[in-house]
Amino acid sequence: MKALYFNGKSLEYLEDYEKPVRGEDEALIKILYAGICNTDREIMKGYRPDFKGVLGHEFVGEVIESNDKALLGRIVVGEINRGCGHCKYCLRGEENHCINRKVLGINGHDGVFTQFITWRNDLLHVVEDNLDPKKALFTEPLAAAIEICEREDIKPTSRVLLIGDGRLSFMIGQVIALTGADLTVLGKHQNKLDNFKSFANVIMDTDETFEIVIDATGSPSGIETALKLVENRGTIIVKSTYTENIEIDLSEIVVRELSIKGSRCGPFKPALNLLKKGYVEFPDVEFFELKDYEKAFSSKSFKVGFKLWED
């Protein structure tokens, strides 16, 4: 089968990659669409130096084989973290933080830039008929945006600064706006900031400070900006992963009594509900064939992905 294999240094397009065989608790999934995430780019820069295999974790697919008859033939999306089921995190329902977890296309398991994958049945979510499968490709990153509201109690009275004007920020911004909070977006590109104007205040510079600051820049400089613009006793939520190491003055954190929270993967059901009900809107995905991966990774479109099969 076709696949994009990361050899530890670069991507290789293969047409003879071995098709996986499912386990008893797994489904064999025909990948219809796969989305490119910034994490994929970071892995290619060295974020996960131990990973070699098929990249990609955002997908929409069709269940071809499964012992769960309710899944057979259904269009699905899938959570990306697969826990061991035995550690303290798994036993208290925090599989995303399992110390032995496998992560699609990131750690210990081939990803979705290929034509077929196997994945555990209970990690799959059915895409209802009234949701376009191409729109469902936003489920995983949208769930990650929703997780911010799980990590921090954002109220209608909260004053929130979102740093970054890229794809992830656009998703986060729409989610935060639904809380009724006073949202301001700080970015560097006026043409991108224009997309936020319907639900947020937009700025390119400020000395004002905010109760909650979210860094979704994907750049180490975002943390520096967040520290300057968060109120004393405020909260910084970090939404990006970085290849580089970042230095932070811990004395400043202590003296100003700041809270810094990481936020990663999130709940799929609310994400599917928001997409299905049209509460969030995103531009269409630009799709490429796997063999054109270089064009895909260099595209400037809002969302880029792979279409794995011809119509």
Q: Residues of each region from the PLM?
A:
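C-terminal hydrophobic helical "lid"/dimerization subdomain
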Residues: 269-311
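Short SAM/SAH-binding signature in class I
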Residues: 210-216, 303
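NAD(P)H dinucleotide-binding glycine-rich loop of Rossmann-like/cofactor-binding domains
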Residues: 84-163
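Glycine-rich beta-strand-centered segment in the early N-terminal region that forms part
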Residues: 18-34, 47-88, 128-131
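N-terminal Rossmann-like NAD(P) cofactor-binding module of classical short-chain dehydrogenase/reductase
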Residues: 77, 214, 237
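Glycine-rich phosphate-binding loop and adjacent beta-alpha segment
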Residues: 220-274, 308-311
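Mid-domain Rossmann-like dinucleotide-binding core that forms the NAD(H)/NADP(H) cofactor-binding site
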Residues: 73, 131-207
